[in-house]
């Protein structure tokens, strides 16, 4: 994937995740690798972690998702 495309896609995914989760993922980082998207960040709910992953899966169904979002106590 070309760099400008990856950057644009990262921004689109970030906006989608923020909208779907109500901005409940802190320090969100998205890394796009060949055939896999890596998510990193922090949230207080397993549900929010899964919502973030679902956003990526819907947008990029052929990509795997490595969900490194950490669930922490609030």
Q: Where on the chain are the PLM-derived regions?
A:
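N-terminal targeting leaders
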Residues: 1-74
